From Swiss-Prot:
Pathway: Amino-acid biosynthesis; L-histidine biosynthesis; L-histidine from 5-phospho-alpha-D-ribose 1-diphosphate: step 6/9. Its main location: cytoplasm. GO terms for biological process: L-histidine biosynthetic process. It catalyses: D-erythro-1-(imidazol-4-yl)glycerol 3-phosphate = 3-(imidazol-4-yl)-2-oxopropyl phosphate + H2O. The keyword Nucleus does not apply. Belongs to the imidazoleglycerol-phosphate dehydratase family. It comes from the Bacteria. Keywords: Amino-acid biosynthesis, Cytoplasm, Histidine biosynthesis, Lyase. Its EC number is 4.2.1.19. The lineage of its organism: Bacteria, Pseudomonadati, Pseudomonadota, Gammaproteobacteria, Oceanospirillales. HAMAP family: HisB (MF_00076). GO terms for cellular component: cytoplasm. This is Imidazoleglycerol-phosphate dehydratase. The gene is hisB.
Length: 197
C-alpha cells in the first residue's frame, strides 16, 4: 500500500493552519494551536488512533477560539481525506467504546463519501477551563464536511465534563484507526457495492 500521508494548509483572514497527517504512524504528536484543551484532545486522537499528527495554527484568539477550532476540524478533515486516497482496501467502518472513570462514550465512523454528523452529547458544564464545549460540535462538523465521513458521537454516561470530552476524543481516535486500517481480505478492492466512495 502506498504511503498514506498528507500535508494541508489553510490560510484565511481568521486563521493560518498547517496539518501533516500519517495514517500509518506510531501516534506521534506535535501541536501548537494556542487552544490548550483542544491540543490535549488531539493528542488523544493521535495516541489512540496511531496516527502521526503535526499541527501548527495561528488564529484570532483575541476574539475567541471559534474560528481556530472550526478551521482545525476543516483542515484535519482535508488532510485525512487526502491521505486516505480512493479508499481501496480499507475497512471503511470503525467504532469504539471508551470509558474514563464514570464517563463512557461511543464513536462510529463510516468513510462513506457522505458527510454527516450526529452528536448526542450533553456536557455537564458549558466550559472546560476556558474552552467552550459548544466548539466540539464545530470541530467535528468541520471534520466530517471535509473528510467526507459519516460520524456518530454519543456520550452514554458521565458527570465530569473533562472526562466526557476525553472519552469522545479517545473513541474518535480508535474508530478512525479501525476504519482506515487496510483489510487484507479486501485485497485492494473498494469497500462498496457501488464501486466507488
Amino acid at each position: 500500500m502506498a504511503e498514506r500521508v498528507a500535508t494541508v494548509s489553510r490560510d484565511t483572514h481568521e486563521t493560518q493552519i498547517q496539518v501533516h497527517v500519517n495514517l500509518d504512524g506510531q501516534g506521534h504528536f506535535q501541536c501548537e494551536t494556542g487552544v490548550a484543551f483542544l491540543d490535549h484532545m488531539l493528542d488523544q486522537v493521535a495516541r489512540h488512533g496511531l496516527i502521526d499528527l503535526d499541527i501548527h495554527a495561528k488564529g484570532d484568539l483575541h476574539i475567541d477560539d471559534h474560528h481556530t477550532v472550526e478551521d482545525l476540524g476543516i483542515t484535519l478533515g482535508q488532510a485525512v481525506a487526502q491521505a486516505i486516497g480512493d479508499k481501496r482496501g480499507i475497512r471503511r467502518y470503525g467504532h469504539a467504546y471508551v470509558p474514563l472513570d464514570e464517563a463512557l462514550s461511543r464513536v462510529v465512523v463510516d468513510f462513506s463519501g457522505r458527510p454527516g454528523l450526529s452528536m448526542d452529547v450533553e456536557f455537564t458544564r458549558a466550559s472546560i477551563g476556558r474552552f467552550d464545549t459548544q466548539l466540539f460540535w464545530e470541530f467535528f462538523q468541520g471534520f466530517v464536511n471535509h473528510a467526507q465521513v459519516t460520524l456518530h458521537i454519543d456520550n452514554l454516561k458521565g458527570f465530569n465534563a473533562h472526562h466526557q470530552a476525553e472519552t469522545i476524543f479517545k473513541a474518535f481516535g480508535r474508530a478512525l484507526r479501525m476504519a482506515v486500517e487496510p483489510d487484507p481480505r479486501m485485497a485492494g478492492r473498494m469497500p462498496s457495492t457501488k464501486g466507488s466512495l
